[in-house]
Amino acid sequence: MFDDFVNGVVATVEGMKVGNPDDEGTDMGPLSSVEARDDAIAQVERAVEQGATLRTGGTALEQDGAWMAPAVLTGVTREMDAFKEEIFGPVAVVYSYDSIDEAVELANDSSFGLSGSVWGKDTDKAEQIARRLEVGMAYVNEHGTTKAGLPFGGVRRSGYGRELGRWGFGEFANTKLVRVAK
């Protein structure tokens, strides 16, 4: 099952159109800078040096700018930098697991906690799993959706507090206390 899933992820990633984000058929645009692209590529290369398997991508594309072929890594272990660090680039790290408890424990074994997603046909079960993730934003069958009325923010080294929605109003207010002792 794992190999079939990974093959599907690889096929999807290899079918993505990387290009001008203003073009309707584009799936992914460039990174924010050439430096950001080079950092992401270096993290992929370091993961491979440490024993991970690069299934596709992870290289600079031959055009001016911060373009990168999206990557898929497998075989990343807890000892590797790719497990411990955030990769700010188009890199999917796919893990195998034997039980839901193991998957949740693996997902929560991080210094970070911005967001996570659970995908499945049984949305009730997926929601139960999503509630166990130690993240600021947990999604079921989607990832990264933001709307003005939804809180945005993480936990641990991914931040504290929330932006947007009623939770974010306090970020833009200067509350003053005047207390008179009697």
Label for each model-derived stretch:
Residues 1-77, 106, 140:
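ALDH superfamily catalytic-core signature
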Residues 14-18, 60, 67-182:
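Conserved C-terminal structural/oligomerization subdomain of aldehyde/semialdehyde dehydrogenase
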